[in-house]
Amino acid sequence: MLTVLSPAKRLAARPRLDLPRGLSPTSPRFQNEADELAAVARGLTAADLRRLMHISEPLARLNVARFAEFHEARTAAVPALALFDGDTYAGLEARTLDEDALRWAQDRVCILSGLYGLLRPLDLIQPHRLEMGTRLKTARGVSLYEFWGDRIALALNERATKTGARALINCASAEYFSAVDLEALSLPVISPVFLEEREGERRIVSFWAKRSRGAMARFIAENRLEHPEEILSFRAGGYAFEPDLSTDDRPVFLRTA
């Protein structure tokens, strides 16, 4: 199986990932496209970035500087797993994955990215903020969805062929998974849902759902799961599979608060 994750908005201040001997950082599949997008973003002002991504003035200025130095700062690139530091990656706990799990994840865990399209965990990337939902005008359209088109789906198909994967576990947000052209994708998609029950009401709690998506990716990598039904034994964070609420492509995991 392949597992897809969203990237993180929050980035590590001091990114670090100690790689076992024999494992080395890799280059992004769509580095040329990332360079193309960075060149477009380099022409934007802080006000433009604030408007496009609804971010603060300091964060907008920081990303103006990042895009201005994008090509020159290539030597500062670090593995994606080391840089991303949000709730999903707290659940993944990449720094404590053993060598076998990390090797497995490198081929089968796929990180969606507005700037880089599709990343492997050890792909070298630079600090940036470019959300997939951004309406950034390029020669290919008026949004990043139009820019990426079917290329992310086709890259996932290639990864599936290489690994023998026969299903895709969607642990990404709706914003990011919308960049996967389902008509071009050759894999069935299973999208786990994480619900919390409190005083008889069931709902998605964003913090715990994000963390659980990362924990699910870790569970799959640590146990080298190959079949969708195997994820139903996931128990991290107090969640348990709830068959009465589930369908084949939407397994629901429930916890009681």
UniProtKB/Swiss-Prot annotation:
It holds the Pfam family H2O2_YaaD. GO terms for biological process: response to hydroperoxide. GO terms for cellular component: cytosol. It comes from the Bacteria. Belongs to the UPF0246 family. This is UPF0246 protein Rsph17025_0016. It comes from Cereibacter sphaeroides (strain ATCC 17025 / ATH 2.4.3) (Rhodobacter sphaeroides).
